[in-house]
């Protein structure tokens, strides 16, 4: 039996040590912003921060959910910070970002799940950095009536919401969420604002079967999702769900081939693929692929 405590060579990354990495780290700290890069212990943080790419996490650093895969703190969240949108806009400007990714913790305690706060952040960035494209990675807004409309009206360039895993694992891995609610949210955003690119992702290596992954791929395409990401699940701490399997690069290539036959504008599937990994470059490719589809 394979030793799952030891990560295979294709998972290993270099430790961050560049000047730009530390400059990015200092700016984020000085502006009192949270990032999912740090909170979720992302393996790509060194590469991304060295390129001044970061995914800012709004709505605080404490989540109201307790997903078994996620390293973000869970508990009773703090009050909303009304100045966070302005500080975020300042960070985008100082880092001279061409593309910014904004995510958040789940806020089941808020009436709209934090949708209006996302909208305020988008508005502030548009004021000071009108040429910056904006990608948001949101919670599922479960039972939050009107949240999808607030997000669609805010007009992000990319709307991302991850289904995370296959439906059969939701009870143990993502107990506070509902698979079909996530699909519905993605579909509704596309119906409300067809010009917004939609994106979703999932992890593999949690014990799912390959046919279940293919079914999720089909479901996401049926929901009119444009961009699919698939990456390897990595256990953040011993208190989280264990890795059931390290999926090989060859298996990821197979999943990518399958997904591409379904009609997605873009597919990224690899061991280190994460929702926001290479997001700026991928957005440019996404637009190019869309234009090619229009003329074909």
From Swiss-Prot:
It catalyses: [[Fe-S] cluster scaffold protein carrying a second [4Fe-4S](2+) cluster] + N(6)-octanoyl-L-lysyl-[protein] + 2 oxidized [2Fe-2S]-[ferredoxin] + 2 S-adenosyl-L-methionine + 4 H(+) = [[Fe-S] cluster scaffold protein] + N(6)-[(R)-dihydrolipoyl]-L-lysyl-[protein] + 4 Fe(3+) + 2 hydrogen sulfide + 2 5'-deoxyadenosine + 2 L-methionine + 2 reduced [2Fe-2S]-[ferredoxin]. The keyword Cytoplasm applies. [4Fe-4S] cluster 2 binds at residues 63, 67, 70. Pfam families: LIAS_N, Radical_SAM. Its EC number is 2.8.1.8. Keywords: 4Fe-4S, Cytoplasm, Iron, Iron-sulfur, Metal-binding, S-adenosyl-L-methionine, Transferase. Pathway: Protein modification; protein lipoylation via endogenous pathway; protein N(6)-(lipoyl)lysine from octanoyl-[acyl-carrier-protein]: step 2/2. One of its GO terms (molecular function) is 4 iron, 4 sulfur cluster binding. It is an enzyme of class 2 (transferase). The keyword S-adenosyl-L-methionine applies. GO terms for cellular component: cytoplasm. [4Fe-4S] cluster 1 binds at residues 37, 42, 48, 276. Residues 49-265 form the Radical SAM core domain. Binds 2 [4Fe-4S] clusters per subunit. One cluster is coordinated with 3 cysteines and an exchangeable S-adenosyl-L-methionine. Its main location: cytoplasm. Its cofactor is [4Fe-4S] cluster. It is found in: Cytoplasm. Belongs to the radical SAM superfamily. Lipoyl synthase family. HAMAP family: Lipoyl_synth (MF_00206). This is Lipoyl synthase. It comes from Rickettsia conorii (strain ATCC VR-613 / Malish 7).
């Amino acid at each position: 039996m394979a030793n799952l405590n030891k990560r295979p060579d294709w998972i290993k990354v270099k430790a961050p040590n560049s000047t730009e990495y530390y400059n990015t780290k200092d700016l984020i700290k000085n502006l009192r912003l949270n990032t999912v890069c740090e909170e979720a212990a992302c393996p790509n943080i060194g590469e991304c921060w060295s390129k001044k790419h970061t995914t800012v996490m709004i709505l605080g650093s404490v989540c109201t959910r307790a997903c078994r895969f996620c390293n973000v703190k869970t508990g009773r969240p703090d009050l909303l910070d009304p100045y966070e949108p302005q500080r975020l806009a300042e960070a985008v400007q100082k880092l001279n970002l061409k593309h910014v990714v904004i995510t958040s913790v789940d806020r089941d305690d808020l009436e709209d799940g934090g949708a209006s706060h996302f909208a305020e952040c988008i508005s502030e960035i548009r004021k000071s950095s009108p040429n910056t494209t904006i990608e948001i990675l949101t919670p599922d807004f479960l039972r939050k009536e009107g949240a999808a409309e607030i997000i669609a009206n805010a007009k992000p360039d990319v709307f991302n919401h991850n289904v995370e895993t296959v439906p059969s694992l939701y009870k143990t891995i993502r107990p506070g969420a509902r698979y079909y609610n996530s699909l519905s949210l993605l579909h509704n955003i596309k119906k409300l604002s067809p010009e917004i690119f939609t994106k979703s992702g999932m992890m593999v290596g949690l014990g799912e079967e390959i046919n279940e992954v293919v079914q999720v791929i089909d479901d996401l395409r049926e929901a009119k999702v444009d961009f699919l990401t698939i990456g390897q699940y990595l256990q953040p701490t011993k208190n989280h769900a264990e890795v059931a399997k390290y999926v090989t690069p060859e298996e990821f290539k197979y999943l990518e081939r399958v997904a591409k036959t379904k009609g997605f504008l873009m597919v990224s599937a690899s061991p280190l693929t994460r929702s926001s990994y290479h997001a700026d470059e991928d957005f440019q490719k996404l637009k190019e692929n869309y234009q090619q589809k229009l003329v074909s």
